[in-house]
């Protein structure tokens, strides 16, 4: 069973579908547990796939009913092995795997380090639960060495628990024989804060390229919470472009463009399509991928490399002056490296004899689970207390609202009313979550377990 948060746009989503396609070719029966999104229809077309539309719990809660639902799915379909791809799935899927004694594979898709503390801020997982997740995994798959080392050091696990498998490309899907048109430029990115400077770097490079090539046209694929900011940047730079939003037909769009701007997976897909691939970077603009630097970029999942910063104008001139023979050499050499090192058929974690897989859950001590549960309750109590404090903050804002409203115009009044409604809704949601936990049958089971074992802990 493949567990993924939501079938929307993104590199992890594409990586999952690439993995699922390869498992399908190898004859596996695959169950996909993910919330519906525009990749769902494409997923349903893959042979041997049973798609289960499953909205996971809110990041701000631990939902015991979701745990029971995942447990029932595992038992109903006789699931033998679970692949967990995103942190959003962990609270319910890990718990269900422990209850059913089902082994699982944990994926570390982080292309950057330093994300684990951010995960703890979501509210549905404390440090002990986070540690348990990686400790109980049969294998941890990391996409690069830096991510593996960070995980290993943070959770104090042995190196043999890990395997590095980079995100790879399905060359049966991404291929092209059409000529390269250097007048057509494509920028691909999610519009989210974690992408940092990637989009603005791409826009600034195109601005320089347009000065040299008046025929250059820019198309942008992507969407997200920072869309308005991106649109403001486009307007500020006075760039004319076609914004297509989030799309699931990236291969066809790449076919129509000769230069691809982006990072990570989209850079690899551009190489597979034999296009000029330019890495925009998360921090600094990185420039063209060639046979001289492709291996260095591969170590960072085709993102920023040390001392890799390039000037926009310099790279724009480099691309503008490319001759046909130079273009052919670049794309052919890049393709050769990628096909050898990033082909999905050679880079997938397959367990041929699942019955013999190492399952640390078998060795999990019952009292250890209880200790972690108590720790999680303390964590949730602290987190909920913060929500209550925010509720008091909302009350204060309410008082300020009524005391100050006579001085406000209609626009400010409307903004304050919306802000107040958001605070009240969030506070009520927190109270509802606490009430759901209190009234659940799992809570009754937990109280009985704690009562029977409190003297043993």
Predicted features along the sequence, with ranges:
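N-terminal strand-loop element at the rim of the active site
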Residues: 4-10, 22-61, 222-227
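Short His-centered aromatic/hydrophobic patch
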Residues: 84-90, 108-109
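Conserved donor-binding/catalytic core segment of Leloir-type glycosyltransferases
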Residues: 173, 177-210, 340
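Boundary detector for helix-to-coil junctions that initiate low-complexity/charged tails
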Residues: 361-457
């Amino acid at each position: 069973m493949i567990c993924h948060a939501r079938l929307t746009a993104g590199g992890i989503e594409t990586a999952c579908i690439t993995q699922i396609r390869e498992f399908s070719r190898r004859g596996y029966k695959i169950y996909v547990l993910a919330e519906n999104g525009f990749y769902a229809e494409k997923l349903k077309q893959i042979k041997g796939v049973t798609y289960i539309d499953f909205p996971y719990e809110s990041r701000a809660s631990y939902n015991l009913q979701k745990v029971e639902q995942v447990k029932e799915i595992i038992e109903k379909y006789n699931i033998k092995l679970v692949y967990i791809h995103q942190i959003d799935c962990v609270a319910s899927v890990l718990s269900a795997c422990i209850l059913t004694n089902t082994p699982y594979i944990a994926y570390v898709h982080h292309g950057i380090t330093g994300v684990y503390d951010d995960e703890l801020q979501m509210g549905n997982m404390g440090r002990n639960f986070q540690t348990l997740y990686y400790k109980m995994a049969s294998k941890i798959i990391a996409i690069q060495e830096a991510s593996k080392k960070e995980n290993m050091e943070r959770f104090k696990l042995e190196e043999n628990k890990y395997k590095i498998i980079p995100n790879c490309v399905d060359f049966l899907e991404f291929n092209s024989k059409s000529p390269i048109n250097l007048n057509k430029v494509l920028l691909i990115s999610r519009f989210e804060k974690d992408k940092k400077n990637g989009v603005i770097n791409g826009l600034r490079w195109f601005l320089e390229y347009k000065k040299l090539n008046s025929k250059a046209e820019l198309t942008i694929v992507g969407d997200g919470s920072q869309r308005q900011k991106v649109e403001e940047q486009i307007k500020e730079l006075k760039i004319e472009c076609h914004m297509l939003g989030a799309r699931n037909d990236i291969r066809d769009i790449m076919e129509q463009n000769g230069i691809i701007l982006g990072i990570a997976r989209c850079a690899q897909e551009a190489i597979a399509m034999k296009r000029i691939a330019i890495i925009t970077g998360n921090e600094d603009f990185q420039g063209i991928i060639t046979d001289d630097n492709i291996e260095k970029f591969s170590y960072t999942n085709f993102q920023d490399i040390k001392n890799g910063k390039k000037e926009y104008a310099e790279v724009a001139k480099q691309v503008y002056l490319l001759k046909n023979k130079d273009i052919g050499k670049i794309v052919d050499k890049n393709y050769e490296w990628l096909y050898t090192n990033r082909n999905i058929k050679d880079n997938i974690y397959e367990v041929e004899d699942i019955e013999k897989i190492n399952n640390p859950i078998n060795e999990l001590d019952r009292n250890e689970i209880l200790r972690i549960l108590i720790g999680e309750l303390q964590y949730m109590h602290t987190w909920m207390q913060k929500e209550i404090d925010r509720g008091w903050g909302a009350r204060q804002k309410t008082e300020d609202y009524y005391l100050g409203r006579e001085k406000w115009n209609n626009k400010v009044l409307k903004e304050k009313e919306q802000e107040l409604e958001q605070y009240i809704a969030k506070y009520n949601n927190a109270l509802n979550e606490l009430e759901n936990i209190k009234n659940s049958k799992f809570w009754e089971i937990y109280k009985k377990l704690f009562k029977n074992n409190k003297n043993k802990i």
